[in-house]
């Protein structure tokens, strides 16, 4: 499956780009499915669906807020080393600076939306 260019999805769904200087050409979404990476963010990567768009909602976000900087660095580095098409933070949740730094190092685009995870997922499925 060829997929859809991320630039098209960003424009169509009015996503906020969190890493402004990241080039999006060549980044494609090949699967219409998404993944909520709660288990991966807690360290469990068996059966990880890395080819899916990764959606960070309130559950994932509040879990990350309970980690110290060393724990965050470890999990962000591990999570973002995979060939992820992009990560989207829902409900206007803001990724922290360390997350953005690790994403940039691994060339993983990070976006935001004011929509809830359910509404974003529904809108995205329509576009893909």
Where are these regions (language model features)?
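Fold-independent oxyanion-binding glycine-rich loops
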Residues: 57-59, 91-92, 114
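Structural motif
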Residues: 52-55, 85-88, 108-111
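Residue-level recognition of alpha-helix initiation/capping sites
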Residues: 70, 92-94
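Charged, amphipathic alpha-helical linker segments immediately N-terminal to NTP-binding catalytic cores
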Residues: 94-119
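Short, surface-exposed connector motifs at secondary-structure boundaries
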Residues: 79-85, 104-107
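Gly/Thr-rich phosphate-binding loop signature of adenosyl cofactor/nucleotide-binding cores
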Residues: 1-80
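A generic secondary-structure micro-motif detector
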Residues: 65, 88-90
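Conserved small/polar residues in nucleotide/adenosyl-binding loops
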Residues: 120-128
């Amino acid at each position: 499956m060829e997929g859809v260019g991320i630039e098209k999805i960003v424009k169509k769904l009015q996503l906020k780009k969190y890493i402004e200087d990241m080039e999006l050409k060549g980044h494609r979404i090949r699967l219409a499915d998404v993944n909520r990476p709660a288990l991966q963010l807690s360290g469990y990567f068996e059966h990880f669906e890395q080819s899916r768009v990764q959606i960070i909602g309130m559950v994932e976000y509040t879990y990350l807020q309970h980690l110290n900087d060393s724990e965050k660095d470890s999990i962000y580095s591990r999570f973002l080393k995979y060939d992820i098409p992009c990560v989207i933070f829902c409900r206007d949740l803001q990724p922290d600076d360390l997350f953005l730094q690790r994403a940039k190092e691994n060339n993983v685009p990070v976006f935001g939306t004011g929509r809830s995870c359910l509404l974003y997922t529904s809108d995205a499925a329509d576009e893909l």
